[in-house]
Amino acid sequence: MTPHFNRLSKEGVFFTNCYANSFRTDRGTVCTFSGYLGLPTASVMKIPAKSRTLPAIAEGLSKAGYKTDFLYGGDINFTNMKSYLLSTGYQRLTANTDFSLAEQTSNAWGVNDDITFEYLYNQLRNRKEEGPWHTAFLTLSSHEPFEVPYHRLEDKIPNAFAYTDECLGKFVDRLKQTPAWKDLLVICLPDHGFYYPREGSNAMPRFYHIPLLWLGGAVKQPMQVDKIMNQTDLAATLLGQLGLEHTAFTFSRN
């Protein structure tokens, strides 16, 4: 299903025992960027009075002099995402309305992944700003109704994931040819797990088992990390590697 990711996992730091903290994008996004636990019956992203008090990766990086950007091909106001992103340090947001009408309607959720990956590649290749930068990108095509412009697998669910994998593989291979690659760190992490194949209970560990991969010229050598970890641990781990303060992330472990 994911030959490109499988190939790339041998080129970077691959965390094999990472688990998602929730079952929805709004929860998983807060878990990832703020290291804050997902709640079963409430979305912190929808509660600005709470979310604006949380630490965040973008906030920490911006204080260290990084330019911060966020790209999503869908409605960035959905589940109050825009408010959360702006309050946690993202300086520039790009969403569906920044694309043509045809591109905005290429998927039920917005702009298909091949279009946004192409946009991101051009943005990174042509970036002129001095100093460090951080760009986050949320894909959307590997989501129900799983209708994508790609037909390698008969079952539409794994086919949608295979499509995003194809987009990722081509993107990384092209990025390797740019001057930015030698200093670049690319982190691949799902927002949540997915119940497929639909066998057994959605409370089973495999429902929450997700991959985490660090790639790029900034990675000294490939390695596999089998230590069990949670999605919330990304914040402290990343900031710790950068030598930045991360004690505010109470639930995140380096």
Segments (PLM) and residue ranges:
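Solvent-exposed soluble domains appended to multi-pass membrane proteins
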Residues: 1-254
